[in-house]
From Swiss-Prot:
It comes from Haemophilus influenzae (strain PittEE). Substrate binds at residues 52-54, 65, 93-94, 119-121, 124, 172. The gene is gmhA. It comes from the Bacteria. Keywords: Carbohydrate metabolism, Cytoplasm, Isomerase, Metal-binding, Zinc. Its EC number is 5.3.1.28. This is Phosphoheptose isomerase. It catalyses: 2 D-sedoheptulose 7-phosphate = D-glycero-alpha-D-manno-heptose 7-phosphate + D-glycero-beta-D-manno-heptose 7-phosphate.
């Protein structure tokens, strides 16, 4: 009944992953992001992650694997997904949803920390504001985007961009793969210090 559609979905996902892998710069950017985060941890810094919708779930997933575990039993790493419901509702109500992440960065972020922002369009105003707040605080910024990078193109210290222009879910599929690779590399790098 749906076998052709199922296969087409899997082939499209495979094609996008192959396209992403074929650009050697993407591989280098993933390594750069992992080292940036690891170096922050080694210097006493932390990661603040944020996103909207499915990207919000990915931001939480990343923070959970940093504080909890990925593949290895090891100490937890300092990470916070900006997801506290009372903070989000307070700032949305009092200031506007475009400030929900930047207010948190202003309150909690410190020089040497890393902001990890996800936006499939690269145009999320609340992530753009968080990037601006992070830079003001002396934080490093990693942006995971899609399409042409949107307004976030060129703003981050490291931008990992998925060049897909159709559906956000395809971009998110690569984002979660990259997050898992980052976790693996961070665990490798932090184990050197242990």
């Amino acid at each position: 009944m749906y076998l052709d559609q199922i296969k087409a979905e899997l082939v499209e996902a495979q094609d996008l992953l192959n396209k992403f892998i074929s650009d050697e710069n993407n591989i280098k950017l993933i390594q750069e992001a992992a080292l940036l985060i690891s170096n922050s941890f080694k210097q006493g810094g932390k990661v603040l992650s944020c996103g909207n919708g499915g990207s919000h779930c990915d931001a939480m997933h990343f923070a959970e694997e940093l504080t909890g575990r990925y593949r290895e039993n090891r100490p937890g790493y300092p990470a916070i997904a900006i997801s506290d419901a009372s903070h989000l509702s307070c700032v949305s109500n009092d200031f506007g949803y475009e400030y929900v992440f930047s207010r948190y960065v202003e309150a909690v972020g410190q020089k040497g920390d890393v902001l990890f922002g996800l936006s499939t369009s690269g145009n999320s105003k609340n992530i753009l504001n968080a990037i601006e707040a992070a830079k003001t605080k002396g934080m490093k910024v990693i942006a995971m985007t899609g399409k042409d990078g949107g307004k976030m193109a060129g703003l981050a210290d490291v931008e990992i961009r998925i060049p897909h222009f159709r559906y956000a879910d395809r971009i998110q599929e690569i984002h979660i793969k990259v997050i898992h690779i980052l976790m693996m590399l961070i665990e490798f790098e932090m184990a050197k210090q242990a």
